Amino acid sequence: MIKNKILAPKLYKENYKENFIEIEDFGDETIFKLLRKRGSNKINLYKKSIDLLIEIQKIKKKIIKNLKGKKYQVPIYENNKLFKEAKLFSDWYAKKYISKKKLPMVNIEINRQIKFLLSNLKIKNETLVHRDFHVSNLIRHKKKLAIIDTQDALIGNMAYDLASLIDDVRFKSNKKLKDNIYNYYLKISNDKINKIILLNDFEILSVIRNMKIIGIFARLAESCLLYTSPSPRDGLLSRMPSS
């Protein structure tokens, strides 16, 4: 990211054996916090986020060097991985509301529908995808916009990060704002983009991503990490995606 003039944390130290790295601290002035401020210019904040996304998507290098100077090829965000992520919905969330008797057949149908959606993706996997491009990972630092949590980036569909930002579960936004953000992306991105295909993939990947998030929240709730009230269900539902 940094070599491509993207403001991202510098890596200072590492200990791969102990799963430890030390990175630059950008503070906590996230776009999420700025959006929640009274009188904030929401569309301007989102436009700046889209500007950054466009710059990230211009990165074409697929082989990079890690901290040890070893070459590392960024993996492809294949449909198989997308399926496994979306399947978290049936693995963890569906079982909370479907009887044990019906659950096997329900899960079969859910997984069938996931595969159907993925089979209808049209855009080639040739864009750097952050995978968590949302308002909590975007930080204003020294009057510039920075991106954090970049370690899981893959080469995938250009619509994925766009869906992550616009249909973000962390910040509720109305349809008008969502449409304005989406149209701004179309305006400043590559003119060769097929608008029909982009919208198709955007909608599919938004569903897939939110299924993954619901599954993750359900799994965390089961392990008592998301309880915000005496009722586990209340704690879970308070964080259910709103998009």
Protein language model annotation of sequence segments:
Residues 56-57, 115-162, 169-176:
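Active-site acidic catalytic loop and adjacent metal/ATP-binding pocket
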Residues 1-84, 122:
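ATP-binding pocket architecture of kinase catalytic cores
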Residues 74-77, 195-206:
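All-alpha amphipathic helical-bundle segments outside canonical DNA-binding/catalytic cores
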Residues 5, 53-67, 93-97, 121, ...:
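A general structural signal marking secondary-structure boundaries and capping sites
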Residues 31-43, 97-102, 171-173, 222-226:
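Short, polar/flexible loop-turn hinges at active-site or ligand-entry regions and domain interfaces
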Residues 227-243:
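Single conserved hydrophobic/aromatic residue that forms the stacking wall/gate
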Residues 61, 65-73, 80-81, 85-128, ...:
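An alpha-helical support segment within catalytic cores of ATP-dependent transferases
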Residues 87-97, 158-193, 204-223:
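Active-site activation/catalytic loop segments of kinase-like enzymes and analogous catalytic loops
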